[in-house]
Amino acid sequence: MKKPLIKKLDNAWANKVKEYGMCESCHKTTYLNAHHFYSRSIRVVRWDVPNGFCLCVGCHVFSSKFSAHKTPAEFVEWAIEKRGLDWYEALKERKNSMVKFIDADYDDLIDKINKEIV
């Protein structure tokens, strides 16, 4: 797949996740980031909006008390508590599915991302 298309999908996904409008942890409304629950290296869920969390930069990266990157075990526990076990199981099942994308699928993904309700 071509890099410009990947970048376009990444931007569409991040913008959709940030439409939530505030940090899902501390409720700040500035310096928002889109965080992947499952790594972006797992393409089957890389652009799934439910795989994203809207976090302020502190909760995403910098805080030593709660940070998706500095305290990942606590983040996973918090995410499951926030979104529920059904969300977690459905996303995990999708992550473990064997899907191979072709270039035409990526164009459809942008439409799917844009239609998601946050």
Annotated model-derived regions:
Residues 38-53:
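Short linker/helix segments within small regulatory modules
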Residues 39, 62-66, 96-97:
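Short histidine/acidic/glycine/proline-rich micro-motifs that form metal-
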Residues 8-33, 56:
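Short cysteine-rich loop/turn motifs with clustered Cys
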Residues 7-8, 43-47, 64, 68:
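Active-site metal-coordination segments of metallo-dependent hydrolases
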Residues 29, 40, 78, 94:
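Short acidic/histidine-centered micro-motifs embedded in hydrophobic/aromatic stretches
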Residues 87-118:
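Short flanking/linker segments adjacent to small metal-binding domains or redox-active Cys/His motifs
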Residues 31, 52-84:
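Short Cys/His-centered divalent metal-binding micro-motifs
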Residues 1-9, 117-118:
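Arg/Lys-rich, low-complexity, intrinsically disordered N-terminal tails that contact nucleic acids
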